[in-house]
Structure formats: C-alpha cells, structure tokens
Amino acid sequence: MAMMVFPREEKLSQDEIVLGTKAVIQGLETLRGEHRALLAPLVAPEAGEAEPGSQERCILLRRSLEAIELGLGEAQVILALSSHLGAVESEKQKLRAQVRRLVQENQWLREELAGTQQKLQRSEQAVAQLEEEKQHLLFMSQIRKLDEDASPNEEKGDVPKDTLDDLFPNEDEQSPAPSPGGGDVSGQHGGYEIPARLRTLHNLVIQYASQGRYEVAVPLCKQALEDLEKTSGHDHPDVATMLNILALVYRDQNKYKEAAHLLNDALAIREKTLGKDHPAVAATLNNLAVLYGKRGKYKEAEPLCKRALEIREKVLGKFHPDVAKQLSNLALLCQNQGKAEEVEYYYRRALEIYATRLGPDDPNVAKTKNNLASCYLKQGKYQDAETLYKEILTRAHEKEFGSVNGDNKPIWMHAEEREESKDKRRDSAPYGEYGSWYKACKVDSPTVNTTLRSLGALYRRQGKLEAAHTLEDCASRNRKQGLDPASQTKVVELLKDGSGRRGDRRSSRDMAGGAGPRSESDLEDVGPTAEWNGDGSGSLRRSGSFGKLRDALRRSSEMLVKKLQGGTPQEPPNPRMKRASSLNFLNKSVEEPTQPGGTGLSDSRTLSSSSMDLSRRSSLVG
C-alpha cells in the first residue's frame, strides 16, 4: 500500500497542487496495475478450486480498485479545474488590459469634449457680441435714414456687393454631383475597420483643405498621428490610415515628395499588419500610383497599379466593379506611355465588368465606352470609335424616351438625316426637328455632352459638316458643362493626325479616385479607392478633389484684378463657378499667382494647341 500523504501546514500554490496531483495520478496508476495483476489469477477460470481466503482477498482487491479509480477521477477533475482557472485568469488579464485602454480613451475623449465645450462657449460669446453689434448697426442705420443731411458717402455702401455680383455669376446652376463610381471603400477592408473618430477627423481635414486652410489641416493631421503613435505604436493600421490622410493633403498642395514618403510608410505598415494581399494595401498602392502619375512617372506607377489590380482580383474576384476601376487606371497609365494595344485590352475588360455587374445604364459604362473610343481614335480605328459614340447616344436616348423607332430617333440619326437632306433645303430646320431629345442632356451625365462633341468632330473629319454642326449645336445648348472646349480641341487634333499616332502629349498628372471610399476612400483610403477617369481625350483627370474650388477661386481672382484695373474685357461667366463665401476667401485668391499655364493645377492640364481654353477650364471632369 502507498504511504498516506499528510497535508502541509503552509498554503500550496496552484503549480504545486498541479505537480502533486500529477504525481498522485502516476502513483495511483501504478497501484491500479499492481492490483489488477493480483486480481487476475484469482478470477481466472483455470484457477480451479479456490484456495482458502481467496474470496476475501478478491473482494478486498476489488474495493481497492474502486477506490483507486475514484482517486484517479478526482485527480483528473482537479487538473481540469486548474486548467479552467488558468483560462479564467488569462481572460481576466485581457479584460483588465481592455479596461485600461478604454479608460485612456475615455480620458482622451473627455479632454476633447472639454476643449470642444470651451470652443463652443467662445463661439456663443462671439455670436452674442456680433448680434449686439448687428443690432447697434441697425439702429445707426435707422438714425441715418432719418437724417435729412446724410452724407453722400453713405450711398456707396452697396458698391462692394454690386461689384461682387458683377464678378460672380448667379448660383442657379449647381455643380454636378460626384461620380457614382467613387463610392466609399473605407469600410471594405477585410477584417480591419477604420475607427469612427478617424472618419470624423478625415471629414474635418477635408473641410479645412477644401477651404484652403492647410495651415489648420496639416497640424491637425500631425497631432492626431503623434497621438496614435503614442497610444498604439507606429506599426498599427490606424497610423497607416492617418498617414494616408496626411499624404492626400500634401498631394493637394503639390508636395509630392512628402506625400510619396508618407504613402510608402503607410504601405509598409499595412503590409506588415494586414498582409500583402489586403484590400487596404491595394488602395495604398493605387494612391501611390496616382501620385507617381501626377509627377509624370508613368513607368514607376504602372507596376504599382498592376499589383493593386492583382490584389483586388484575388480578394474581390475578376468581375468586381473595383477591379474595373483599377483596370481603367491601368489603361490610362498605359495610354500615357503609348501602349495602345494594352489600353484597348484593359478598357475592354473594364467595360465588360461594368456592363455585366452594374448594367448597361450605369454611368461608368458610357464613360468607359467614351475612353475606349478615344483609344480607337489614337489607333486610327475611326469606324469603331463612331460605333461606340453612337451606342452611348442611343442608350441615353432609350433611357429617357424609350426604344428607337421611326418617330423616336436618337440625335445622331437626326444629324445624319440632316446631312443627307442638306441639298434639298436651303434653310436649316428648326431645333424642334430633333424631337425633345436635346432635353436629355440636362438630366444625363457630362459623358453625353462629351460624346456629342467627339462624334461631331469625327463627322467633321469625314466631311459631314451639317451632321457635325447638328451635334455641336445640341451640345452647346446643354446648360450643364459636359466637356470643355479644350477636350474637343484634343479630339479634333487626334482626328487631324489621320494615322493615329501613339506618341501622346504629356497628359495631366491629376488622377483621382472613384468609390470611397472617394473615398479614401476613399476616407481610406480613405479610401476611396482613387479612380482615374478619362474625358474621352486620353488625358488623366482627377475627380473628387479640391481642384474645382481652386480653379474657381483662381479665375475669380483674375477677374477681380481685371475689374479693379479697368479696361480689360471680362470673361463670360462660368455657370459652375460658385460665389466666394467671404472677402477673406477672395483676398486669399487674389494673392495667389494667376499666370495662365503656370503653377498649381494649371500645370496638370494636357499640353495642346488649345492652351487658352485649358487655362479657363472650371473643373477636372471624372
């Protein structure tokens, strides 16, 4: 029999209890084996007649075996209980660490709330003071009205307002909405979700940057980045997100080297923390390719764009709309390198995806067809380009007015009929001959207006002047700006080349995102996954950026300087240019250089013979 173990007086630790239990289990298993060896001869059938006392020995051995089995079971229960207690303790430690993090975050939020409350209090005080000043000014104004000997200078009070009304057009026409293809991609990053506070911070930074207040947006990003690195460390997905936001702000300031450094850092962090095949890595690669494209480094941008395409095909499948956006980006890069065959291949793939997944009426289908037609023009495939242009116009017509029949024809059919019957009539038919198709331009995307002008230029090359005039007249009646004269000029230049040269002019370096993310999305990327969109001329353009606001302010400042100097004819008002919200905005714009074709976004226009038109463009169409 084994010796009895007496408990020690001191308290045993959990590890000591586990070790002691394991030792007891080994001893009990050995003892069980000995008992079974002793019991086996006694219960064997060939034992013959039982010896005296063997029955009692058998009973005692059986009782001992039962006690041993019970002891082994209790020892196993003790081990299982010890393992469970260890797991509970580990979970307890995790919960404590989480509580500490939540306490820190709560403290940070309390500090932010306190600061915001102070700002709100100061704002309320300022509002109250301004309201009091307003009441005082109203009182003084009433006194002046009652004064019969009012000073003549008082009549000049409305001059600044009238001057601004002359300089800025009415705001009846709103700017076109962002492209539907630039959806938010920030939430589509696999297992990583961007925190809500970073989304809020991104929106705040975008607001400041859109107002040109980079002196506020950049320090805000840097402070948030510093706080994130202190709390989460440098190699954290949130840090990569913040780096991406700051890079986009730098990119909008034309600080491309700083933006490239930040994007490379964000790419390294995301590859390390999220894996090399994560959608967020693809979004960062795309943003980096956009940046290289803006700097004219198309060869360096192409492998980045291809890698982003491989990741998205692997994660999302080869027929996802985001894959089509990436294919369009890659096609634009190849187009700027003169790789016409690859451009055609990528646009065809993108068109197939858009038509299959989003339907034939999606704006991206018409936009991609327009870009593919531009590619055909560069290759001299005029018949293929004409077919695509007609498909775009026919689809737009059917969407608005139903299927095509003898009485319901798209505009290009009317144009060709007018061309055929031009010798039979002296005067041009009234515009009502087209039916009511021209109204479709008011509700369709700018791609329709682009197509009208491009097909008109193609007709003009073929000598169909009446048909070309019909389409151009229809496009000019469109109040929404679809394609600026610069783009039309570039299409005409392509047609004049005849042979479809591959040598592209240096295109605009502005390329933007679609999603978004848009948004990085692209908030993240913020993503939005940035998408480059062509205008049918092969140049790279940027959508969803601050370029529209900058161009409007630049032209406003030019007109203001001319107005103040006097004697210089004023440019016709642009319906997409908004009024400045304050004189501070206007003064800031006046101080900026206004040389046409100089620095800023004017450098990102395609170089062509229509440089004067390029300097007057109001936005980057996407």
UniProtKB/Swiss-Prot annotation:
UniProt GO molecular function: cadherin binding; kinesin binding
Gene designation per UniProt: KLC2
UniProt modified residues of type Phosphoserine: 151, 175, 179, 445, 508, 521, 581-582, 589, 608, 610, 615
UniProt subcellular location: Cytoplasm, Cytoskeleton; Lysosome membrane
Biased composition (Low complexity): 538-547, 601-622
Functional note: Kinesin is a microtubule-associated force-producing protein that plays a role in organelle transport. The light chain functions in coupling of cargo to the heavy chain or in the modulation of its ATPase activity. Through binding with PLEKHM2 and ARL8B, recruits kinesin-1 to lysosomes and hence direct lysosomes movement toward microtubule plus ends.
Compositional bias segments (type: Gly residues): 180-190
Each TPR repeat, start to end: 198-231, 240-273, 282-315, 324-357, 366-399, 449-482
PROSITE patterns (UniProt xref): KINESIN_LIGHT, TPR, TPR_REGION
Bilayer topology: Peripheral membrane protein
Keywords of the record: Coiled coil, Cytoplasm, Cytoskeleton, Hereditary spastic paraplegia, Lysosome, Membrane, Microtubule, Motor protein, Neurodegeneration, Neuropathy, Phosphoprotein, Repeat, TPR repeat
Family as reported in the entry's similarity comment: Belongs to the kinesin light chain family.
Protein name according to UniProt: Kinesin light chain 2
Gene Ontology CC annotation, any one: mitochondrion
